């Protein structure tokens, strides 16, 4: 009798939309359904199947470790050969002392003549440098005077005159040549022998 009364009270208190067997599901999924626009996924959809553990043979594992230790010892004993830099190595034929040019001893008159010639050459180059410097200074002064006169005549022409000339850079120059070029010269396409040395380093395989 008491049990029937309790069941009737429970049926009266529960909501009409309540379906048997869904109460537990609502309680369990409330933390997942925060938004109605969100994707309603369940916990099993975010999970992945358990991976099967591989059985490792202790003997194979120990054999692999031994092979690795043996390879390391082999590398420590025989270090790799460094590739030589041929540009920094002087050929043996150039180290022969018999090919050295003996030092010439000049007479006092010849030494004096060379010293005077060097002084005259230094004086000539100094005068040439001063002449070039004076010519550049006079050209700059004339250019500045012409710009000032142009500025008084027309501001637009002055603005165009002081603009940077983009055709000056990059600067390309050819010559002077030691010999005059030969017109209609075709360079011969001959054969050549490649004597570049190729070095191979031994790699130890696992």
From Swiss-Prot:
Q: Name one GO cellular component term.
A: mitochondrial ribosome
Q: Per the entry, what span does the transit peptide take up?
A: 1-46
Keywords, A to Z, come to:
Mitochondrion, Ribonucleoprotein, Ribosomal protein, Transit peptide
Top-level taxon of the source organism? Eukaryota
Q: Where is this region: Disordered?
A: 170-189
According to its UniProt entry, one GO biological process term is: mitochondrial translation
Tissue expr: Ubiquitous.
Which compartments does it reside in? Mitochondrion
Q: A Pfam family name for this chain?
A: MRP-L28
Tell me its family.
Answer: Belongs to the mitochondrion-specific ribosomal protein mL40 family.
The UniProt subunit note reads as follows: Component of the mitochondrial ribosome large subunit (39S) which comprises a 16S rRNA and about 50 distinct proteins.
> What is the designated name of this protein?
Large ribosomal subunit protein mL40
